[in-house]
């Protein structure tokens, strides 16, 4: 097996480990590192053909195999087995951009982790035309640290998130609320399959809670036609459960006063002021 893998043109190095089991089949772990800057075609060929050959050579039902490579300054890891691995790997190579630090292709998702920066790059959100979003069978996620705040994007096939003003929302967060803040945009949330924006901030005490940060974020997305829900979370370090204020949206307009309304109404009123997101 080592000889076969090492003989492939695109392969730089191979490591094979066998873990004997007393009453079960032996467990095989295979790490394959490709030569730098491989083409999409060569990656797809190794991922598809090499895994099938390794299964044949070991006689095992399953082999844990990791194919890794570096493209520019981006490290990519493909974990096998997975369905349509060659298509996923090929599409990922096409989607790579210089700002990406680490990319992982796994059984159910492709995750793109970006280098820390002070401002969100323009056109950060992957468009529906991206090869990875046309796959359909895998979740596609993007994550980046913007200064002291985290930003996550979770995609779904057929959902275009590019119109959601995530960059503007991040920039409107008051400086004293940016440390540890999280802004998450989901094409489909787990329960209701709605396009949802979640903003989470930290306060030292519930007494420090104010509507300014929440209103600023909400104001940036008023009028957006894609979002169906906005959730604003506030956490105190000593408390396990954050406080949540939710807003359902339809055609860019908030429906009702928020949930709970006694918390939502003042946030919505502040968000609707002309200078709320500036």
Residue ranges and their predicted role:
Residues 35-39:
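Structural beta->alpha junctions
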Residues 25-30, 40-156:
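Long, acidic/polar, low-complexity amphipathic helices and coiled-coil-like
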């Amino acid at each position: 097996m080592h000889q076969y893998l090492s003989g492939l043109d695109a392969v730089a190095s191979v490591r094979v480990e066998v873990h004997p089991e007393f009453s079960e089949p032996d467990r095989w772990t295979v790490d394959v590192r490709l030569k730098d800057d491989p083409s999409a075609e060569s990656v797809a060929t190794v991922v598809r053909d090499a895994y099938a050959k390794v299964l044949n050579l070991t006689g095992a039902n399953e082999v844990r195999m990791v194919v890794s490579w570096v493209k520019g300054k981006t490290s990519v890891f493909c974990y096998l087995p997975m369905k349509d691995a060659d298509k996923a790997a090929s599409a990922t190579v096409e989607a790579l951009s210089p700002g990406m630090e680490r990319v992982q292709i796994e059984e159910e998702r492709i995750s793109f982790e970006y280098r820390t920066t002070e401002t969100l790059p323009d056109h950060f959100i992957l468009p529906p035309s991206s090869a990875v979003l046309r796959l359909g069978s895998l979740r596609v996620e993007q994550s980046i640290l913007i200064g002291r705040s985290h930003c996550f994007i979770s995609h779904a096939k057929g959902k275009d998130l590019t119109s959601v003003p995530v960059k503007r929302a991040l920039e409107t967060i008051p400086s004293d609320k940016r440390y540890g803040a999280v802004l998450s945009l989901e094409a489909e949330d787990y329960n209701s399959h709605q396009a949802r924006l979640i903003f989470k901030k930290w306060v030292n005490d519930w007494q420090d809670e104010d509507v300014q940060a929440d209103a600023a974020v909400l104001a940036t997305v008023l009028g957006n036609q894609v979002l169906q829900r906005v959730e604003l979370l506030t956490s105190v370090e000593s408390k396990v459960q954050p406080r949540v204020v939710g807003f359902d949206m339809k055609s860019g307009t908030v429906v009702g006063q928020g949930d709970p309304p006694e918390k939502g109404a003042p946030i919505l009123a502040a968000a609707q002021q002309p200078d709320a997101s500036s």
